[in-house]
Each structure stands twice: as structure tokens, then as C-alpha cells.
Amino acid sequence: MLRQRFVFDTTALTDSQAWESEGCTTLCEGMSAILHRVAQARLHLGISCYVPYPSVYNEIRDFVRNNNCDIAILGKIDTWLVKKTPDRYRVKIPSKIFYEYVDYMRSRINKGMNVSEEAIWEAVSRCLSISATGEGREQMREEIEREVVGSIIRKFREKYRAALRYGILDSAPDIDVLLLAKDLDAAVVSQDLGIQRWAEQLGLRFMEARAFPQMVREYMSFVPLHTEELEDRMV
């Protein structure tokens, strides 16, 4: 079997669909189960799974701590995930990709600006309709804060995220995942739409987080190992 390499982003371990496919009901159980699959892939299939260090590695460790997971999971992370810093000076990205990214970001920023303008106009219109009723100033202020400002801000946040965040690379760890995969000629494992989009632009193999455990299970079903062989491979 051709030796394969995969680069994980944080969602490769934290995506609910990935660990629910393993029959888990909590994030901590799910991360442990997926790391078990990573161990199987390493020992029996010659598959190596990497995480960019320190960016993604620290994000994953923070997830473990913030969700009060068993400290043993930290040990599994250090044991089975290969930590590597991408060579940001050696990896070359075609100028066409850079041009397309800037153009794409400009269009998303314009969408975000349109969402902002819509929210402002809606707020003004609703405030005018309330003031037209002739209520007392204090009562009007409370009603505006309660009925107008709060609801518009919630709606604005949802639309702004959709316009500006989904499908883009919005953090250094996202970029590190792509650079490391490019450096290693590895596949990317993620549930992030931005990483997926730009992995495809860079010609990188991409696998959704939920598909990785299924892939390992499928491989393992065709690798019948006797007890002696298992022990030998674990030495």
C-alpha cells in the first residue's frame, strides 16, 4: 500500500459528525475515538497524521482543556499526531492563487459592507416608526434598545458571518494546515469550508473530517492480522 500522509486541522478531531460516526456522544469521547483510529492507521497501515506546530497543536490542546477532557487525551495527541512546523520560506504558492485570494476577499468584504448598510437602514426605519407613535422619550429609548437594537445586531452577526467568514481563510492555523500539506504532499483533513476551497485551489487532496475514521475502518477490514503480528508491529 502506498504510504499516505494527512494533515489535520482542529476540526478533524472536534467535528461532531466525525466522532458521532464512532458512536460517541461527547467531544472528549469523540476525540479519543478518532485518535484511536489515528493509532490504528499508524501501526497497521503506515499512515502518518500531522498537525502544524505550534498553531493547530495548541488549538487542539486548548479544546481538550476547555472541555475538561481526560488528561490521557493529551498523551494520545503527543503520541500519535506528528507535530511539524511548515516551512513557510520554502513552500511556494503560485502567484495566480494569491491574485485569486485577494480578488475573492475583496468580493466578500463588499458583501460584508452591504450587510452593514442594510442593518443601518433597517435600524433607522424601525426607530423612526417607533418615534412616530409619540411615546415618552424614556419609554421609547427602552423599546428601541429591546426591540430594535438587540434583534438587528443578532441578525447582522449571522449575515455578516455568512458574507465574510464562511469559505475564507481567517486564521494563521488555517494557512499553516495548507502550507504543511503542500510541504509534505499530504492530504488535508478538515471540516472547514475555507480550508477545503483553498486546498482545491492548491491542488491538494482533501478529505472531510467525518470521512477519515470511516476510511481507516474500511482499510482495517481488509488487513487481517494475527495476535503475533500485532505485537510485533507495536514493538
UniProtKB/Swiss-Prot annotation:
Keywords: Endonuclease, Hydrolase, Nuclease, tRNA processing
Domain of life where this protein originates: Archaea
Example GO BP: tRNA 5'-leader removal
Top-level enzyme category: hydrolase
Gene Ontology MF annotations: ribonuclease P activity
EC number(s) reported in the record: 3.1.26.5
Reaction catalysis annotation: Endonucleolytic cleavage of RNA, removing 5'-extranucleotides from tRNA precursor
Family recorded in the similarity comment: Belongs to the HARP family.
Function: RNA-free RNase P that catalyzes the removal of the 5'-leader sequence from pre-tRNA to produce the mature 5'-terminus.
Name the record gives this protein: RNA-free ribonuclease P
Native organism taxonomy: Archaea, Methanobacteriati, Methanobacteriota, Stenosarchaea group, Methanomicrobia
